[in-house]
Amino acid sequence: LNKKFHFAVFLPQYENLEYWKSQIAGIEKAAIEFSKFGIVLDYFFYDFNISSFKESVKKVLEFDCDALLFAPIFYEESVRFLSEYEKKNTPIVMIDSNISNNDQHAYVGQDAFQSGYLAGRLISFAVKNERQILIFKITREIESTSVYLQRIDGFYSFFKDHEELQNFKFSEVTIKDSGIDQLNLEMFSGINSVFVPNSRAYIVARFLEQNNIKGVRIIGYDLLKENIEYLNKGVIDFLINQRPEEQGYMGINHLYKKLVLQETVANTHYIPLEIILKENYFPARKS
């Protein structure tokens, strides 16, 4: 009865990143709940750079455990790591993004394509006249991740599927980091709506506010403090919430069901996408 189950948790460092902090909070919540069943978590963190990721990969591959919870950020390195890890024949759950075609692995998280498709609908909603849409990519190298690209793909697909929406014209801007000094007024000349396919919508919002540009519809992701600030001010219109805490919790829950209860569990668990507007954002009260 007193068997211990060791789960390796392999994630990016989270100190100042709310999204990953929330993932960890969900994982911790599950850890506490399931500790009485002998579940022990061993954490492996990597910094947001490839060399740190590779260092941690070595440790994770050497570590003996019953299952792995993994958030793949660097696409190619993660694919390589997975194919190496598969030789261990232990269950693997991915959270945040799904990079594997292997049906044996589980995935808990958003359907990235679908979330981009949803953003397309939100942009087109209740709009009749000619619209200029800007897809604003604020990306560090790591975000050539599949999630990012799938969201953009989903976004364009919405308009492909709705050919009657002839009044939308698209342009793209890419900046390399989140410095507001990279933005200029010309980027937004004539623009009616902006889609930011990651959690940095607040950078666009801050720029528009500073330059007193009003009436631009902004859609982004994730309930970061800064995003919420501009949502409440009415500068950001919609945020798509991926419920990171639930992802972390469900990832551990999946392994608990599979290994401890030995239940058959579905390998894909999509977290429902939440559309957050100023009017329906009620922060969770810390009890």
Give the residues covered by each predicted segment.
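Hinge/beta->alpha junction and helix N-cap segments in small-molecule ligand-binding domains
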Residues: 12-21, 42-52, 109-115, 136-154, ...
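Hinge/cleft segment of the Venus flytrap/periplasmic-binding protein
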Residues: 140-144, 159, 243-287
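Hydrophobic alpha-helical segments within soluble ligand-binding/sensing domains
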Residues: 107-133, 181, 243-260
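Flexible loop/hinge segments that line or gate small-molecule binding clefts
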Residues: 77-114, 224-232
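Conserved beta-strand elements of the Class I
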Residues: 8, 132-136, 192
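Signal peptide-proximal N-terminal region
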Residues: 28-40
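Hydrophobic alpha-helical
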Residues: 67-86, 171-226
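N-terminal helix-turn-helix/winged-helix DNA-binding helices
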Residues: 1-17
